[in-house]
Amino acid sequence: MILIKDLIVKLGDFSLVIDHLKINDGEYFVVLGPSGVGKTVFLHTLMGFLKPLKGRIEVNGIDITHWPPEKRNFALIPQDYALFSHMNVFNNIAYGLKIRGLSKDYIRRVVHEIASILEIEHILNRNVDSLSGGEKQRVALARALVVKPHVLLLDEPFANLDPRLRAKSRCFIKRIHERLRFTAIHVTHNIIDAILMADRIGYMKEGRFVTVLYPKEFIKTEYARPYLDEILPLSEYLKNSSYNN
């Protein structure tokens, strides 16, 4: 479980303020909000890239507030995926294992294991510049998951995908999460992604979480009103399905 208490992070004139937030083990937690409200600042604080002025971040009762990124066992997939263009797919996925000094046999085995789960074994020898947007996303996901993180952070993971690939990727990542059961924190400004993927939605406004609710509850709030045209077609579907119960 991740527990955040009395947290303040300053970045220029911007302040991220979190009085109390709990994210459960194995949860798919979606952070929703428009641009500029602090969603990426929140992820970078969890990763240890930004240092709080005050407050605590705990994981299973252990205070990790001042731990360096490499000690936290968190993995981040940035919006642009940040793949290494001079490496093939195998070496991109293996990068985090190599810098940990692990054996070649171990690296080869676990890279092929995660590539099989993500259905990308057939592209391991290709250069990343030759990949489609959906393939790049899966490579970035494989590179993050191969180090077996306790928490996976996703920053607008579908931003560069067309609507068809976006829908396909939603289903794929949800299926992988259900299989591997890591804790996921997914940042987006897209309410459809939030409703269809989240166990719970945390809505951010001006650097604060103003509500944390289950998707079926969130769509009834004032914070969902700006997205009304997008969510109306989903309302009946959610009402009559077991999705996100």
Which residues make up each language-model segment?
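ABC ATPase NBD coupling module
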Residues: 63-78, 99
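Conserved ABC ATPase "signature" region
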Residues: 105-123, 174-175
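Catalytic Walker B motif of ABC-type/P-loop ATPase nucleotide-binding domains
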Residues: 152-156
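Conserved ABC ATPase signature
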Residues: 127-131, 135
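Helix-to-loop junction immediately C-terminal to a conserved catalytic motif
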Residues: 47
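A short, proline-enriched helix->beta-strand linker immediately N-terminal to the Walker B motif
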Residues: 146-150
